[in-house]
A protein has these predicted regions:
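N-terminal cap/lid segment of alpha/beta-hydrolase-fold proteins
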Residues: 24-81
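Short beta-strand element of the alpha/beta-hydrolase
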Residues: 83-92
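Active-site glycine-rich loops that stabilize anionic/oxyanionic intermediates
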Residues: 91-96, 226
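Catalytic nucleophile-loop/oxyanion-hole region of alpha/beta-hydrolase
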Residues: 99-101, 106, 120-153, 264-271
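Primarily recognizes the serine-hydrolase "nucleophile elbow" in alpha/beta-hydrolase
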Residues: 134-216
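Short beta-strand/loop motif that positions the catalytic acidic residue
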Residues: 216, 222-224
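Conserved alpha/beta-hydrolase "acid-adjacent" motif
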Residues: 229-236
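C-terminal catalytic histidine-bearing segment of alpha/beta-hydrolase fold enzymes
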Residues: 239, 243-290
Length: 290
C-alpha cells in the first residue's frame, strides 16, 4: 500500500471512529440496583399475562419491552458527597410497551451527570393503565422509604416521563387523596406526591388530567415541539392550568422535534435538557453552583 493510501485509510478510520463515538448512546456507567415493586402474591390490580420480552428491532437502536408482568425499577445512583435528588423515569410506548433505553436508561445516564440518581421504572404494559398507575405510586414510596440506603434526599424526589410515561408522571403529580391500592407494608406510609415533575412530549394530558391541576400539583417542566400535532394541544391546556393555579412551572415549546426523541433529537427541541437543568436549578433541586 502506498504512503498516500495509508494516510487516506488512517483518516477514514479516524472519521469512522469519531462518527461512532458521536452516535454512541449514553448509558449509566455502573450496573443499577433492581428492586421489585411488589412482594410475592401482593401485587394489586390486574396482572399482565406472559413473560417480559423485547419487541423486534426497528433499526432505530431502541430497545422496546413489553409484557411487563413483574414491575420493578432500577436505581442508578449519582456520585455525590451529599444526599442527591432522585428522579423516577417512566419510558413511553403508548401503554403498549416501553422505549426502555431511549426514554429510560439513557435519561438516567444524563441525570447522573447532573448529580441526580435516576430510577428507571418498568411499569405494567400492555394495556394496563390502572396497574401502571399503581406501580408508579408504589415506586415513589419505595424510593422515599429507602432514601438513606441509596443516599437520596427525601425532599427532592421527582418524576420524569415521556409520551405515555409523561401522562403517567403527570397523573401522579395531580393525584390527591389516598393511593389507589390498599396498604401492603411500611413503604406505603410514605407520601405519594412528587416534589417536581418533568414531562417530555407527554401524551393524553387532555384526557381528564387538566381539570385535576390545582394549587397542590407538583412544580412542572414541560418540553414539547409544535410539530407533535397529536399531543401538543394537551400540553398547551395543561400549561394553561398550571399557570391559572399559580403552580411553579416552565414550558419549553419549540417549533420542531416531533414525538419520541428522548435525548436524541437534532431539531429545535434538542436543547430541552439544558432548559430542564436550568429550571431544576431555579426551583432548588440542583445547586446553583453546578
Amino acid at each position: 500500500m502506498s504512503r498516500l493510501n495509508i494516510i487516506a485509510a488512517t483518516l477514514l478510520l479516524g472519521a469512522l471512529n469519531a462518527l461512532s463515538a458521536e452516535q454512541a448512546k449514553p448509558e449509566p456507567e455502573a450496573p443499577g440496583i433492581v428492586v421489585k415493586l411488589w412482594p410475592q402474591d401482593a401485587m394489586p390490580g390486574r396482572a399482565v399475562t406472559g413473560t417480559e420480552r423485547t419487541l423486534p428491532a426497528r433499526g432505530d437502536e431502541v430497545i422496546r419491552l413489553t409484557d411487563i408482568s413483574e414491575p420493578s425499577f432500577t436505581v442508578y445512583r449519582a456520585e455525590s458527597a451529599k444526599p442527591s435528588p432522585a428522579v423516577i423515569v417512566s419510558p413511553g410506548g403508548g401503554y403498549g410497551g416501553l422505549a426502555y433505553n431511549k426514554e429510560g436508561t439513557e435519561v438516567a445516564a444524563w441525570l447522573n451527570t447532573l448529580g441526580v440518581t435516576g430510577v428507571v421504572l418498568k411499569y405494567r404494559v400492555p394495556n394496563n393503565r390502572e396497574g401502571a398507575f399503581q406501580d408508579i405510586q408504589r415506586a415513589i414510596r419505595l424510593v422515599r422509604q429507602r432514601a438513606a440506603e441509596w443516599h437520596i434526599d427525601r425532599a427532592r424526589v421527582g418524576v420524569m416521563g415521556f409520551s405515555a410515561g409523561g401522562h403517567l408522571s403527570a397523573r401522579l403529580s395531580v393525584h390527591s387523596g389516598p393511593a389507589t391500592y390498599p396498604r401492603i407494608d411500611a413503604a406505603d406510609d410514605q407520601p405519594l406526591r412528587p416534589d417536581f415533575a418533568v414531562l417530555g412530549y407527554p401524551a393524553y394530558l387532555d384526557e381528564g388530567l387538566v381539570p385535576l391541576v390545582d394549587g397542590q400539583t407538583s412544580p412542572t417542566f414541560i418540553a414539547h415541539a409544535e410539530d407533535d400535532k397529536r399531543f401538543i394541544k394537551g400540553s398547551d391546556a395543561y400549561f394553561a392550568a398550571l399557570k391559572d393555579t399559580k403552580t411553579p412551572h416552565a414550558f419549553f415549546r419549540c417549533a420542531t422535534g416531533g414525538h419520541g426523541h428522548g435525548l436524541r433529537s437534532e431539531n429545535d427541541v434538542k436543547v430541552w435538557p439544558a432548559k430542564c437543568r436550568d429550571w431544576l436549578t431555579q426551583i432548588g433541586v440542583l445547586p446553583s453552583a453546578r
